Amino acid sequence: MFLRKENNELAIICRSPFQVLCAIEYLRSNIIEDYTFYLLSFSNDDKSEEISANVLGLYNIDYIVCRYPKLKDYFPLLKSELCNKYNYILCGNFFDAGQRMMASIIGSNRAVITFLDDGNQTINAIKQKSYYVTFDSVTNTLRSLFSGFLFIKKKCLLNNFFTFFEYEDLRVNIKKNDFSHVLINRNKINEKDGIYIIGTNSRSLNHFLDEKNSVELHLTRLIS
């Protein structure tokens, strides 16, 4: 159910630089030129928005900034020409209630929603039910319930993931992201001596670890 390259009814919703890179890889690997790129932001002073915009600039991609810090900011979309417009949507993060709410509004009946890679969050997302509810705040809870209602009403398809993780699950459709198109002709940086620390939500890795490695990971958490 992934997007066919000849279809031009595509919207992209992202909030972070990494999500932007995944979206660019999707566009290039599928040779898609007709789309609308929405950069979602919750404030006027958003560092993530600034970096994401710089990344899009490197690839000469036009984008529209959408600032929806409050729940009521989404309601004008319901009466706009964007409502029910797109048959296909790339959504940066399965767990982002704001992205899901926007996708549920601008998506058409039976719209195909493909979730882009958001690191270890993708592993958690694949395990979750399609209509995930975020309870970290009242606003996000309402966003989740509202988007879940629209997704069900419109019978949207929410089981597509574009990820670099190897994961076999009959409930979802997974397309491999190897970043091969994003990396083409990019300048390489020579390796330098030093220590590189990559932060991650280690709980998401438990699914891939055997008992011995899980214990080692737990001990690492305790002493770090």
Predicted features along the sequence, with ranges:
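Nucleotide-activated donor-dependent transferases that construct or modify glycoconjugates
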Residues: R4-S16, I197-T200
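Short boundary motifs at domain starts and secondary-structure transition points
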Residues: M1-K5, L27-S29, L78-E81, L183-E191
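A nucleotide-sugar donor-handling region in carbohydrate enzymes
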Residues: D117-D118, I123-I126, S130-S204
